[in-house]
Amino acid sequence: MQRSQRLSQMLFVTLREDPAEAELISHKLLLRGGFIRRLSPGIYTYLPLLWRVLQKISDIVREEMNAIGAQECLLPQLQPAEIWRESGRWDVYTQAEGIMFALKDRQGREQALGPTHEEVITLLARDLIRSYRQLPQILYQIQTKFRDEIRPRFGLLRGREFLMKDAYSFHANEESLRQTYQDMYRAYGRILRRCGLEFCVVEADAGAIGGPSAASQEFMVLASAGEDEILYTPDGSYAANVEKAVSLPPPAADSPYTTFQVLDTPGTETIEKLANFLKISPTLIVKNVLYQALYDNGLRVVVLLSIRGDQEVNEVKLANHLNRLAERYQANKLLKLTLADAEIQKSWQGDPIPVGYIAPDLPDSCLGRQKNLAPQILRLADQTAALLKNFVTGSNQVGRHVVGANWGEQYPLAEVVDVRKAQAGDRCLLNPDQILETARGIEIGHIFQLGLKFSLPMRASFTDEQGSEQPLWMGCYGIGVSRLAQAAVEQSHDANGIIWPVAIAPYHVVVVVPNVSDPEQTKVAEKLVQELAAAGIETLWDDRDERAGVKFKDADLIGIPYRLTTGRSLKQGKVELAERATGQAVEIPIEEVVATLKERIAAALAVPD
């Protein structure tokens, strides 16, 4: 990597105002600082300063991957549809999530731009791995990925094109997979620490990559503007993405009702209105929520979920449960789960539905006879609802509710599931003395134990020591390189601009010449740049014919860790050394500059294992 650069010769343009397109401060600063330029929604050019940052992050990733025995390769970005159909994920990625760019070539063959590479790597393993003697294997790549986001936003955090490291491991057994998973866990921690980031590791939902039963953890960079909510205990014993989190809900209040009654409750279509009308706690109410599930065979299934009135539905957990029921409906996968609004309910072409007053036994007659609509409602009850006695719920009549109801008496208890959304203030399931707290995070890394999810449908196998054919055990491990760069900015900035961690800063030091027409200032600056570069210190030389104030503002904006200024103190044989992170400035003798910076940079790069 180039050790020194004149700023006057760089393609370098900064902006004084925040771009209208940017919402997050990190996005604004990357645009204003001349790091990125938008081509179209979700697609950005990485300009020279950011490219240096990305190269440094990539180098750190490579070093840590190589240290655990992973081998770098490069996989095709253009992938044939048949391998995605073989794994069973083509419809999931093109219809359900709809995030894959799909196209047809001139021969009419379906292709896709890879959002991920499990299919490609599994096919490669199927072709090349024959024996247990070849295992384990870990391959990784760093390359551009593509995802057709519905609403690209937040700059590099949710783009349609992004830089990512993805690794894949193959094993003879589950024990070997778990060992590599732990190796990756430790390597990811080292990567983020070396990049100077504060992070936490959380239990996570495996999504379409791992499936509902895969072990999975996310590496979250803590930031108030993060898209993901994290629930954690103060003692650090538990942390999870809210999609995966479990907890103990607060106990329900005692019911004042001892007999079953039907009451007139006009104008109480919501839990809040009903609780106020009856002067009871929402914890005594069973609310009944309608969803429509679409499976990959085209069948729509209406789901009625009963849950305690003070709780919210975790739709990720619900979707995972419905995915496990796919075989019941002669399907392979759930494609889509949608809250049933008025338009969807109308499409069922059945009896009118008493919205706001639905009971657990809503009749199946609300479903018309249609070819692709299951004739019976799938009824589920969250644990919070299943435990209630003498509860309040709808009556299937507009303007009326029932009180004093019980499962097994007025209503049959449906299949009991755990699909409530854990929330801050709940007690921790593992240690009820700990109360869950909340934070925001940006997902940077995600590791999965895939098990046999891909090897079985794609017939990727090996011969074991006994000569028997066995499926390959598999793991996958991703880290967003371009996301990491922006997350660092989101976590480390001030009112004046970016504060890059030393390890991933585009340059270690910027040398500012306040007055380029002063030959002494220029001469000293040139000598310092040469000496710093020779000592391995990456140096940006601001030799532009600009006002000193502009140069200082730009230096703060782009966040170079150290700034040297060849100003008035030259008469005393000194230059000013300012640290971007602290704002502290000192004057040091010119002959001590190299040694001082080497010492400071070495200290900043020394990260404990």
From Swiss-Prot:
Compartment(s): Cytoplasm
Ranges in coiled-coil conformation: none
Gene Ontology cellular component list: cytosol
Disulfide bridge positions per record: none
UniProt keyword annotations, A-Z: Aminoacyl-tRNA synthetase, ATP-binding, Cytoplasm, Ligase, Nucleotide-binding, Protein biosynthesis
Coiled coil keyword on record: no
CDD domains: ProRS-INS (cd04334), ProRS_anticodon_short (cd00861), ProRS_core_prok (cd00779)
A Pfam entry, by short name: tRNA_edit
Catalyzed reactions per annotation: tRNA(Pro) + L-proline + ATP = L-prolyl-tRNA(Pro) + AMP + diphosphate
Entry EC no(s): 6.1.1.15
Cited function: Catalyzes the attachment of proline to tRNA(Pro) in a two-step reaction: proline is first activated by ATP to form Pro-AMP and then transferred to the acceptor end of tRNA(Pro). As ProRS can inadvertently accommodate and process non-cognate amino acids such as alanine and cysteine, to avoid such errors it has two additional distinct editing activities against alanine. One activity is designated as 'pretransfer' editing and involves the tRNA(Pro)-independent hydrolysis of activated Ala-AMP.
Assembly description: Homodimer.
Family stated for the protein in its record: Belongs to the class-II aminoacyl-tRNA synthetase family. ProS type 1 subfamily.
PANTHER family: MITOCHONDRIAL RIBOSOME PROTEIN L39/PROLYL-TRNA LIGASE FAMILY MEMBER (PTHR42753), PROLINE--TRNA LIGASE (PTHR42753:SF2)
Protein name (database record): Proline--tRNA ligase
Lineage start: Bacteria, Bacillati, Cyanobacteriota, Cyanophyceae, Synechococcales
Encoding gene, per UniProt annotation: proS
